[in-house]
Structure formats: structure tokens, C-alpha cells
From Swiss-Prot:
Interacts with the host calmodulin. This is RxLR effector protein PPTG_18954. It is found in: Secreted; Host cell. It comes from Phytophthora nicotianae (strain INRA-310) (Phytophthora parasitica). A motif (RxLR-dEER) lies at residues 45-58.
């Protein structure tokens, strides 16, 4: 368990030293942490799926829910009725035929 800790510690030190070596000026490394307003807006927009709009749930404009603008493709599909009694009888006949064939050939 200690060896895993030491490996993680060495990895953290090497990662930190390579970051410091990549940015000799301390101000340059901080520039990566700052996001521009354009990228923050773009990130917010990309969270919405295509075909969704925000519907305001309150009159003051605070809060809202996502609502799909597309028509729903979830439709109720009726499954045909299958008569299981007939299928069970056919399965029993098939099992009996297989058992007879195996008995005739001497297989188990």
C-alpha cells in the first residue's frame, strides 16, 4: 500500500515540475485557469440537446425547465397475441422426437 502512495507522490511531483518547466513565468500558468466569457457561454449552450427550449416556470424569469420541441416518437405498439399452448405442444413433440433420435443412435 505504501508503494502505491509513493508512486502517486512521485507522479504528482513530476507532473508539477513539468508544468513549472513548461511555464517559466508564473503569470503564464495562471492564464490557463481563466476562461473567456465567450467560451463559458458556448459551454452553457452545448449542454442543451438539439430540439430543446427553456420554458420559464416562474414569472420573474428565474428558473426554468427543458422542454422538447420535437414530436414524441414513443408510441404504443400492440404486440400480437401468441397462443402459448400451441407452442408448448410443438416443443414437447420436438423434445420427444429428439429423445427418440438419440435413443435410436445410442447418444445420451
Amino acid at each position: 500500500m505504501r508503494s502505491v502512495f509513493y508512486v502517486a507522490l512521485v507522479f504528482a511531483v513530476l507532473a508539477r515540475s513539468s508544468t513549472v518547466a513548461a511555464f517559466p513565468h508564473t503569470d503564464e500558468s495562471q492564464l490557463l485557469a481563466v476562461t473567456s466569457p465567450d467560451s463559458a457561454t458556448h459551454t452553457k449552450r452545448s449542454l442543451r440537446a438539439a430540439g430543446q427550449e427553456v420554458v420559464q416556470s416562474t414569472g420573474n424569469g428565474n428558473g426554468g425547465i427543458f422542454k422538447s420541441t420535437l414530436t414524441s416518437i414513443n408510441k404504443v405498439v400492440h404486440k400480437p397475441e401468441i397462443k402459448l399452448g400451441g407452442l408448448i405442444e410443438k416443443a414437447k413433440i420436438a423434445q420427444a422426437a429428439k429423445a427418440f433420435k438419440n435413443k435410436a443412435t445410442g447418444k445420451k
